[in-house]
């Protein structure tokens, strides 16, 4: 048998740095490394670097949210309405590779988390962003990644849909930022006090909105140029059973064009539902920037919703034109369409030069002219995190007033919003109603 001589360790030239056994070293092992003996019982586990980075990003997002919430509270207490005021930070954001950063964040979001850590991470997120975990359709342990958790479905019945046929419902959970009526071609939507953008720029040059605007404007202009015709008693009819005067405008109702902007916070439910029964005729994908969409960004970045990446669904419902724009943001570049799973947003090959993105990618759904029929409340899309949805739609506009003997009277919109700016709303709740006409 061969013998091996074991040499004693040479003295260290730096005694203070010499390796010495620690009498309590067995009490200070890393929590993420098991010894050989304990490994047989518990298994070895090393925290992935991607998971650690995800936790760090989670902490940063939480701190940023707390800071922004405090600023919002202070402004509300002072009664100050946010105004548009560009700053250096907004200009600096254009220099950052936000699209690449968002793709990296998306990769981190897809990292599978250890089963025993999932409840703790998801509960921490829920506390930070006010999410209701009781509505989740599955136990927390069954969501393998943060992305799966963010786009989670809800328990059946969590979002009852208003069944009134004369109403539109909210497509998302979120905060109502802006709402109103568009009057005439080229009408602007207010982004924030002091700055507006056109609905045509948001939806695209080939949008069917242009035809709806021109038709509505032409009808209104014709009525204003012939006021005598609308007041003439020859238009009235009398019911023999119950004498009553009817105005011709009630027999031939007009259509108005309305809009509603809803912001989804990171803690909100992230799926987009259909606001009405409608036919989705075309899809338009704009490859753009991925600026953030928090309150600071809204009041400092020009054309925020127009420049950001977005997917526009456009079609027809029983009252006319309707469109939904799902707008991406930093870390939310991926917009998923359930009616078109193959669509990919925030693609690496997309180029944006001199703030001019590539032309939009259009698709007309088959059968042409009919498209895809979706019911009110049906899921149609989803975000990875918080973002913004803009609805533009036609709704009935008729005269509720009766003309007096002197020919005077008032004209009001038959469609009324049930909500106002600043309200919190959930999927399925009515955003507006109109009265039935005989």
Curated annotation (Swiss-Prot):
Protein's UniProt keywords contain Nuclease: no
Cofactors required: pyruvate
Cysteines joined through disulfide linkages: none
Catalytic activity: a 1,2-diacyl-sn-glycero-3-phospho-L-serine + H(+) = a 1,2-diacyl-sn-glycero-3-phosphoethanolamine + CO2
An annotated Gene Ontology molecular function: phosphatidylserine decarboxylase activity
Stretch forming the transit peptide: 1-21
Origin: domain of life: Eukaryota
UniProt site positions, description: Cleavage (non-hydrolytic): 386-387
EC number(s) given by UniProt: 4.1.1.65
Segments on the Mitochondrial matrix face: 22-48
Chain ranges on the Mitochondrial intermembrane side, renumbered to this chain: 68-438
Keywords, in A-Z order: Decarboxylase, Lipid biosynthesis, Lipid metabolism, Lyase, Membrane, Mitochondrion, Mitochondrion inner membrane, Phospholipid biosynthesis, Phospholipid metabolism, Pyruvate, Transit peptide, Transmembrane, Transmembrane helix, Zymogen
Biological process according to GO: phosphatidylethanolamine biosynthetic process; protein autoprocessing
Family of this protein: Belongs to the phosphatidylserine decarboxylase family. PSD-B subfamily. Eukaryotic type I sub-subfamily.
Function: Catalyzes the formation of phosphatidylethanolamine (PtdEtn) from phosphatidylserine (PtdSer). Plays a central role in phospholipid metabolism and in the interorganelle trafficking of phosphatidylserine.
NCBIfam families: PS_decarb
Complexes and interactors: Heterodimer of a large membrane-associated beta subunit and a small pyruvoyl-containing alpha subunit.
Official protein name in the record: Phosphatidylserine decarboxylase proenzyme 1, mitochondrial
Gene name tied to this protein: PSD1
């Amino acid at each position: 048998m061969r013998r091996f001589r074991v040499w004693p360790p040479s003295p260290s030239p730096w005694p203070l740095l010499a390796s010495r056994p620690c009498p309590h070293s067995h009490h200070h092992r890393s929590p993420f490394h098991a010894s050989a003996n304990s490994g047989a019982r518990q298994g070895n586990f090393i925290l992935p670097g991607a998971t650690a980075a995800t936790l760090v990003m989670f902490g940063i997002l939480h701190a940023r949210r707390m800071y922004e919430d405090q600023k919002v509270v202070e402004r509300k207490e002072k009664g100050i309405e946010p105004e548009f005021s560009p700053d250096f930070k907004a200009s600096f954001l254009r220099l950052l590779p936000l699209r690449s950063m968002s793709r990296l964040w998306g990769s981190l979001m897809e990292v599978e988390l250890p089963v025993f850590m999932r409840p703790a991470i998801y509960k921490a997120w829920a506390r930070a962003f006010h999410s209701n975990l009781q509505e989740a359709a599955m136990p927390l342990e069954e969501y393998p990644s943060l992305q799966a958790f963010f786009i989670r479905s809800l328990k059946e019945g969590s979002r009852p849909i208003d069944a009134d046929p004369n109403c539109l419902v909210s497509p998302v959970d979120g905060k109502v930022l802006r709402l109103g009526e568009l009057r005439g071609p080229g009408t602007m939507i207010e982004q924030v006090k002091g700055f507006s953008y056109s609905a045509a720029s948001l939806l695209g040059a080939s949008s069917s909105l242009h035809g709806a605007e021109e038709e509505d404007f032409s009808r209104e202009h014709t009525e204003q140029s012939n006021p005598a015709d609308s007041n003439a008693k020859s238009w009235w009819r009398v019911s023999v059973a119950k004498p009553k005067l009817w105005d011709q405008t009630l027999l031939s109702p007009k259509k108005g064009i309305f809009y509603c902007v809803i912001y989804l916070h990171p803690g909100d439910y992230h799926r987009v539902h259909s606001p009405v029964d409608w036919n989705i005729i075309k899809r338009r994908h704009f490859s753009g920037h991925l600026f953030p969409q928090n309150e600071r960004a809204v009041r400092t970045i020009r054309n925020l919703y127009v420049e950001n990446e977005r997917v526009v669904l456009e079609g027809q419902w029983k009252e006319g034109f309707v469109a939904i724009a799902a707008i991406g943001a930093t870390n939310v570049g991926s917009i998923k369409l359930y009616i078109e799973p193959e669509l990919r947003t925030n693609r690496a090959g997309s180029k944006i030069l001199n703030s001019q993105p590539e032309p939009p990618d259009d698709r007309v759904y088959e059968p042409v002219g009919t498209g895809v029929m979706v019911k009110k409340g049906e899921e149609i899309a989803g975000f990875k995190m918080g973002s913004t949805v803009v609805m533009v739609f036609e709704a009935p506009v008729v005269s509720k007033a009766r003309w007096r003997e002197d020919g005077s009277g008032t004209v009001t919109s038959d469609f009324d919003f049930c909500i106002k700016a600043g309200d919190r709303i959930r999927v399925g709740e009515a955003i507006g109603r109109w009265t039935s006409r005989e």
